[in-house]
Swiss-Prot record:
GO terms for biological process: glycine decarboxylation via glycine cleavage system; nucleoside metabolic process. It catalyses: N(6)-[(R)-lipoyl]-L-lysyl-[glycine-cleavage complex H protein] + glycine + H(+) = N(6)-[(R)-S(8)-aminomethyldihydrolipoyl]-L-lysyl-[glycine-cleavage complex H protein] + CO2. Its EC number is 1.4.4.2. It comes from the Bacteria. Belongs to the GcvP family. N-terminal subunit subfamily. The gene is gcvPA. This is Probable glycine dehydrogenase (decarboxylating) subunit 1.
Length: 455
C-alpha cells in the first residue's frame, strides 16, 4: 500500500506546471553516486521476531559504570517520575500551544519556574530553553539588550567555560556584532585569577560570564568576579549545575549584589543520559531584566469570574510580534523534560536534593583521595570542587581511558582534546549512584591498567 497521497495524474499535472519531465529531474543536482536506488529493506517480521531481534541488538550494549560527567551526569531517577511524565496528559501535550486550554500543563511549568527561581535565588524563570549551551547564548543576547549603559557589545568570559558552550555561543552570535574576550585560566588552581581581571579594566563590557562549578569542576571565585563585573558596569551571567545549588550558595548571593542572569543545563534534575539529549536549558533572572527574557513565561492570574488560572505572559516572541523585535525565536521549549524536572524536584524536595548533592560530593572526594594514593597519580588542582575533579596520570590519559573500558568502566573525560597541557589528565565524576564497592573496583582497575600499560 502506498502512503504517498498524490495520484499519478496529480503528479503529472504538477510536473507539467513547473516544466519537469519526471520526479527524478527534481533531484538531478544530486550526483548519481550519492543516490540510493533501492532501500534494501527486508520483508516484514512479526512482533515475536521483532522482540527477539531487538533483544539481540540490546545485548551488544556495554553496561559500563560511568564516571565521565563533563556536562552530563548520571543520577538516580526514581521510577515514579517518568511513569508520571508518560501519562497522556503530559506526554502528548507538552508544549503550550493554545496554552490556556491546558491549565494542568501550564501549572506544571509555573511550578517549575517557581522551583528554579527558588533554587537560583532569582526573581523570575522562563519555561526552559533547548539545552545549557543555547541557554547561555540566549543569556548573552539578553544581557546585551538589557544593559543599556554598556557602550559596546563585548562580553568577557572565563577560560574555564565549557568548551561546547563556547562554540555554541560563538556560532549563534557570529553575525550579530558581538565580541568576546577570554580571561586565561590559572594553571595552578583550575579557575580564573581575579587579579587578572584588571588587565581588562579599560574595556567596556556588557556582560561577564562566570561558570561555577566550571568545566574543570572547580568552584570559581564568584564573589570577586561578580563584584569586579558590577564595578565596571557589566551584568553577570552565571552558568551553573542546578544540582550543586542544593549545597552551594545561590547565584543571587554572589558578591555584594548577586548575579543578574542564571542559566545552565537542567539534565541533572530528572532527565536521563540519552546520547546527548533531549535535555533542557534553564534561565532565571532578576525582575529588572524579565522583559528581555526569551522563551515562554507562565504567569498566575484570575479569569473574568474571579477563578485563579495560568496563562502565558510577556510574550515578546516571534509568534506574537515582528521577528526583528522579538526577544526569542525559539519555536518550542523542552516542556516534556521540564515536566520530568518538576516532578523530580517535587518528589525529592529540598532535603532530597541536598542529600543527592552531598553524597555526590562525598563520593567524588573519596574517589579522588583514593586515586591519589596510587603511585604516579595525583589530584591536579588544590582547590574546592563539587562532584568533578581533574586527575593527573603517569601515562597518556586517552590510552588509560581506552584500557579502562576493557574493565567495564568509563573512567572519565579525556582532557587532552580540551587543552594540550592536559594530555595526561582525566576528569572524573561521581554521584549518588556510585557505591563504595564501585569506587573500590575503580581503584583496583586503575592499578591493574597502569601496571599493564607501564604506569
Amino acid at each position: 500500500m502506498s502512503f504517498i497521497p498524490h495520484k499519478l495524474e496529480q503528479i503529472k499535472k504538477m510536473l507539467d506546471t513547473i516544466g519537469a519531465s519526471s520526479v527524478d529531474q527534481l533531484f538531478d543536482e544530486i550526483p548519481r553516486h550519492l543516490r540510493a536506488d533501492t532501500l534494501n529493506i527486508k520483508d516484514g517480521i512479526n512482533e515475536i521476531q521483532l522482540a527477539n531481534l531487538m533483544r539481540k541488538r540490546a545485548n551488544k550494549n556495554h553496561h559500563n559504570i560511568n564516571y565521565i560527567g563533563a556536562g552530563a551526569y548520571s543520577h538516580h531517577i526514581p521510577a515514579a517520575i517518568w511513569d508520571i511524565v508518560a501519562r497522556g496528559e503530559f506526554y502528548t501535550a507538552y508544549t503550550p500551544y493554545q496554552a490556556e486550554a491546558s491549565q494542568g500543563g501550564l501549572q506544571v511549568i509555573y511550578e517549575f519556574q517557581t522551583m528554579m527561581a527558588g533554587l537560583t535565588g532569582m526573581d523570575a524563570s522562563n519555561a526552559s530553553m533547548y539545552d545549557g549551551a543555547t541557554a547561555l547564548a540566549e543569556s548573552v543576547l539578553m544581557a546585551i539588550r538589557s544593559n543599556k549603559k554598556a557602550k559596546s557589545q563585548k562580553v568577557l568570559i572565563a577560560e574555564a567555560l565549557h568548551p561546547t558552550y563556547l562554540r555554541v555561543l560563538e556560532t549563534i552570535t557570529k553575525h550579530q556584532g558581538i565580541e568576546f574576550d577570554i580571561v586565561n585560566l590559572d594553571s595552578k588552581n583550575g579557575k580564573t585569577d581575579v587579579t587578572k581581571l584588571e588587565d581588562f579594566a579599560n574595556t567596556n563590557y556588557a556582560a561577564v560570564v562566570i561558570q561555577s562549578p566550571n568545566f574543570l569542576g572547580q568552584l570559581a571565585d564568584v564573589d570577586g568576579i561578580t563584584n569586579w563585573a558590577h564595578k565596571h558596569g557589566a551584568l553577570v551571567i552565571a552558568v551553573t549545575n542546578p544540582m550543586s545549588l542544593a549545597i552551594l550558595k545561590s547565584p543571587a548571593e554572589w558578591g555584594d549584589n548577586g548575579a543578574d542572569i542564571v542559566c545552565g543545563e537542567g539534565q541533572p534534575i530528572g532527565v536521563p543520559l540519552a546520547s546527548g539529549g533531549p535535555y533542557f536549558g534553564f534561565m532565571t533572572c532578576k525582575m529588572a531584566h524579565v522583559r528581555q527574557m526569551p522563551g515562554r513565561i507562565v504567569g498566575r492570574t484570575v479569569d473574568l469570574d474571579g477563578n485563579e488560572g495560568f496563562c502565558l505572559t510577556l510574550q515578546a516572541r516571534e509568534q506574537h510580534i515582528r521577528r526583528a523585535k522579538a526577544t526569542s525565536n525559539i519555536c518550542t521549549n523542552q516542556g516534556l523534560m521540564v515536566t520530568a524536572a518538576t516532578i523530580y524536584m517535587s518528589l525529592l524536595g529540598a532535603e532530597g536534593l541536598e542529600r543527592v548533592a552531598s553524597i555526590s560530593h562525598e563520593n567524588t572526594q573519596t574517589l579522588a583521595t583514593e586515586l591519589a594514593k596510587i603511585n604516579g597519580v595525583s589530584i591536579r588542582f588544590n582547590s574546592a570542587f563539587f562532584n568533578e575533579v581533574v586527575i593527573d596520570l603517569p601515562v597518556n590519559a586517552e590510552t588509560f581511558v581506552t584500557e579502562m573500558e576493557k574493565e567495564a568502566i568509563d573512567a572519565g573525560y579525556f582532557l587532552g582534546e580540551y587543552h594540550s597541557d592536559l594530555a595526561n589528565s582525566i576528569m572524573v565524576c561521581a554521584t549518588e549512584i556510585h557505591t563504595s564497592e564501585d569506587i573500590k573496583e575503580y581503584i583496583e582497575a586503575t592499578k591493574k591498567v597502569l601496571a599493564r600499560i607501564g604506569g
